[in-house]
Amino acid sequence: MKPTSSFLNLPQSGIRRMYDLAKNKKDTVSFVLGEPDFVTPKHIIEAAKKKLDEGCTHYTDNAGILPLRQEISRALKQYDKVDYDPEGEIVVTVGGMMGMYMAILALVNPGDEILIADPSYTNYVGEIVMNRAVAVPVPVYEKDNFNFTYENLKSRVTDKTKAIILNSPCNPTGGVATRETMETVAKVALE
């Protein structure tokens, strides 16, 4: 059986391509996967083992383990002063990309457009394409600290625009969204 055209037309991950090139090179410092260069701390490993020994080896709720969602809710309230219901407003996914995929699936229809910074994390395009939406690159520049400006963001909006992906700090540029950037994105979204 041959793979579908949807599968064959997915863009290859530039990050994985770089990972494959660098993995067998000596003295290479890899910035590819965004994982730490240290072993998981011992107390975390021991806590995971303890939970396994206690029988926590089965499927979780679809939204994730309730005590974890409750702790996330508590932390959000304490640190960010926002209140989310752990039983209906918080979902734990198996990773950031799965969370992005689910958010895109929930918010856009096939053919809808999603604005993304250019340059941006290469896997965003794949996530968007897998949801049969259209990635619309919005150039960001060093002179603007790789932040969206009103003009460059607004110029890419069409009647098909349904979402804007804002990643801060941005991979790969390192740009950090300022309050002004957040207000700009909100203004464009509301218009």
Predicted region positions:
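Active-site phosphate-binding strand-loop segment of PLP-dependent enzymes
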Residues: 136, 141-191
